């Protein structure tokens, strides 16, 4: 269970606060106006940016001071963060090791991850030889192989067309349910939230609000979200 206790994130003149309790094995969408700090929030949560005060707790343990690799979190970025000179197998294997040599056990783990995202037989392909959807699947396989209970997603499927994006969202939902993962997904598209998010958090006016049922939020969006969506 993820708790944020009076968390404050400062970057220059920008400031963001968040106090949340009891985020569990659900999919949470994070929405808000452009420039509200959604990506900054995820980066700080993952440990890539410092927090000014407050605490991040996982199952009651304070993890605020842990390095990114030590945290129970895996992050999927908008650009997939794949290395163009490495094969799909090697890109996924980076979740386990940076060494070039893979033991037979690790090779099987990588193959299993690629199989789970529908890319069996694509181990030798480099990112430039893959479609956008396939690249997203490679990145998702790498995240899955990290086997972390919290998944952080920063608009990972934005560059995909509607059909491919929905396919990836559905796959993400299935995998999250299988693993009982806590998923925080930044998105600018209300349809993404409606499709897979159990609850939605609004980030506006430098404050991250507590989650509410997604259907409820979209049926009667707060003023800031309504303005962002062009509904006011």
Where are these regions (language model features)?
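A short, proline-enriched helix->beta-strand linker immediately N-terminal to the Walker B motif
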Residues: 145-149
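Catalytic Walker B motif of ABC-type/P-loop ATPase nucleotide-binding domains
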Residues: 151-155
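Conserved ABC ATPase signature
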Residues: 126-130, 134
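ABC ATPase NBD coupling module
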Residues: 62-79, 98, 103-107, 220
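Short coil-to-helix segment of the ABC ATPase nucleotide-binding domain corresponding to the Q-loop/switch region
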Residues: 86-95
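Conserved ABC ATPase "signature" region
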Residues: 104-122, 173-174
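Conserved ABC ATPase "signature" C-loop
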Residues: 205-206
């Amino acid at each position: 269970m993820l708790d944020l206790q009076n968390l404050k994130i400062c970057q220059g003149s920008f400031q963001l606060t968040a106090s949340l309790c009891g985020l569990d094995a659900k999919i949470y969408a994070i929405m808000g106006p452009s420039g509200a700090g959604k990506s900054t929030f995820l980066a700080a949560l993952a440990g890539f940016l410092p927090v000014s005060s407050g605490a991040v707790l996982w199952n009651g343990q304070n993890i605020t001071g842990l390095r990114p690799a030590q945290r129970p979190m895996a992050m999927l970025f908008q650009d997939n963060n794949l290395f163009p000179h490495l094969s799909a197998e090697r890109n996924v294997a980076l979740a386990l090791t940076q060494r070039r040599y893979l033991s037979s056990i690790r090779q099987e783990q990588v193959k299993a991850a690629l199989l789970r995202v529908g890319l069996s037989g694509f181990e030798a392909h480099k990112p430039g030889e893959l479609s956008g959807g396939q690249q997203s699947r490679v990145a998702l396989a790498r995240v899955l192989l990290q086997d972390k209970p919290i998944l952080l997603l920063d608009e990972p499927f934005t560059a995909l067309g509607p059909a491919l994006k929905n396919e990836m969202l559905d796959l993400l939902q299935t995998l999250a349910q299988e693993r009982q993962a806590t998923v925080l997904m930044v998105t600018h598209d209300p349809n993404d939230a409606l499709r897979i998010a159990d609850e939605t958090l609004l980030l506006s006016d430098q404050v991250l609000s507590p989650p509410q049922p997604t259907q409820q939020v979209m049926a009667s969006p707060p003023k800031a979200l309504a303005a962002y969506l062009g509904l006011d």
